[in-house]
């Protein structure tokens, strides 16, 4: 069994304490066992739909889907894949907002298992620590690689960064298109959903909140 990093353990514990962890049930299956089980179920689904798995275009589809689920689009369910995070002392005494905009985000709606596609915007005001900029992108992508609802995803990213940076002064905004709305049901191809989660001074200080929201429009 792969041991988890200190950062992964801290973040998981924080999410569990706040009731923000993705609904999970522990099982003893390793990655290979999960892939084999999913492949068998996917094969049964395709056969139920009447698809010919003897066709060379479809024969490997159950295997591809199983591998994609475990190794890629749902890899964020496994904290062993939590990114290696570099947090360093704020020696330059930076005390103004740092913002990373337009972080590409692809997730999966947990209600219909179809795509959520959008952009995340992250800001924080350093206290004692700063984080490598690319690590923010990786943390966003880690939590996106799960079955998700956008509201929880936004809050998970917020709490993870608050935990790692040792400050409440973090703000997150996500704007995304949901294919459960675009490709089925109401079939609305133009709407999108925006969620925001604010902590610390971004929540309590109107000027700081306004600075963050203005930064989203630039």
Swiss-Prot record:
Signal sequence bounds: none
Residues where Zn(2+) binds: 109, 112, 180
Q: Which GO terms describe its molecular function?
A: GTP binding; GTP cyclohydrolase I activity; zinc ion binding
Q: Say if the entry is tagged with keyword Endoplasmic reticulum.
A: no
For this protein, the Enzyme Commission number is 3.5.4.16
Catalytic activity reported: GTP + H2O = 7,8-dihydroneopterin 3'-triphosphate + formate + H(+)
Q: Name one GO cellular component term.
A: cytoplasm
Q: Does the keyword Nucleus apply?
A: no
Q: What is this protein called?
A: GTP cyclohydrolase 1
Among Gene3D superfamilies, the record links this protein to: 1.10.286.10, 3.30.1130.10
Belongs to which family?
Belongs to the GTP cyclohydrolase I family.
Q: What keywords appear on the UniProt entry? A: GTP-binding, Hydrolase, Metal-binding, Nucleotide-binding, One-carbon metabolism, Zinc
Q: In which pathway does it act?
A: Cofactor biosynthesis; 7,8-dihydroneopterin triphosphate biosynthesis; 7,8-dihydroneopterin triphosphate from GTP: step 1/1
Please give the subunit comment from the record. Answer: Toroid-shaped homodecamer, composed of two pentamers of five dimers.
SUPFAM superfamilies assigned: Tetrahydrobiopterin biosynthesis enzymes-like
Q: Name one GO biological process term.
A: tetrahydrofolate biosynthetic process
